[in-house]
C-alpha cells in the first residue's frame, strides 16, 4: 500500500477517454478533475453540450437573463451523478464570494450555489465559465483503477481548452497537450 505522500493528485487535470472506454457515458469525453483525493474524485465533462441553453435553464429557475451573448451558450452534460444539479466551473471573480464554491488547484473555482448564476444574470459574475448539469464521480481508488486499465489518459488542464475552444474541438485539443491525436490512439494496452 502506498503512503499518502506517494499518491498522485490529479486535481486540475484533464481525463481523456481512451478508445476502449467501456462506459458509453464517457466515450469520447474530456473530464476536468475538480477534486482528487484518497476519498475519490469529482470531475466535469467539458465536451458534451446538451440541447439546453443558458436562457432556457435560467427561465426554469426563475432568473432573468438579458445579456445577449450569453443567451445561447449551451449547458453541458457534466456526468451521470446529480444530473438535476448545476455545477459552474469558472475563473475567480475578484471580491466575489459564492455560497458553495470550491477553489481548484490551478486557479479555477467550481460553484454549485444559485448565487453564481444570479451574478451571471446581472453581469457581475464570472466572465469565463462552463455550466454543467451533473458531474462525474469516482469512489476511493476507482479512478486510479480505470487509469491503470488504460481507460483514461491524463494531462495538466489548460483553461483555454475549457473556455475558449469550441466543444467539438476539445477532445483533440486536450490530446494535443500530450502531443498526440485521436488517430494515434489504440484501445489495446500492452507491455514491451
Swiss-Prot record:
Gene3D superfamilies: VC0467-like (3.40.1740.10). Transmembrane segments: none annotated. Disulfide bonds: none annotated. One of its GO terms (cellular component) is cytosol. It comes from the Bacteria. It holds the Pfam family DUF179. PANTHER family: UNCHARACTERIZED PROTEIN YQGE, UPF0301 PROTEIN YQGE. Belongs to the UPF0301 (AlgH) family. This is UPF0301 protein Bcen2424_0864.
